[in-house]
Amino acid sequence: GTDGLAIMPAVVAEATPPYGGTGYFVGSPKDFDRANALDVSQLFTFLRATQPEAFEKLAMGDPSDPKDINRLKFLTRLSAEIGKRGVIDVLRKGVEHGPLHFDLFYGTPSEGNEKAAALHSQNRFSVTRQLAYSMDETRRALDLGLFINGLPIATFELKNSLTKQTVED
């Protein structure tokens, strides 16, 4: 018997399934690193899947720990490159971090190139609702944020005339 104790099924960590079966992933606001403006979960999932050896060489003790020094160094470097070169250039050319190079997007493969097709299929397009971006106590949030492999592409502030929200609000 179980002596009145409930038996809990084993919990398996699994990526959120694609949004509506169309290749979109649902991002979580808690995965958004406000200091660096990156969806860390989507970024690290992409890097682990496409460049596992380089990702391991980052030597993060715990990639989910925001205080891990190697995690901080990598995210700060990536954020600085985005600030300097822009997100499109970083997606196209990747980023250098010490001796390592990281590709951050895989473009449309040529026909018959199975390796490129496999890498392209690992790109992660995600949508995050209620994206808190302010670093202060106001906790201001955007209605939607769009990301490719954890890098921000677009934000949306949705308005509703039925609730008297307009572009001026």
Name each model-derived stretch.
Residues 1-169:
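An alpha-helical interface "stripe"
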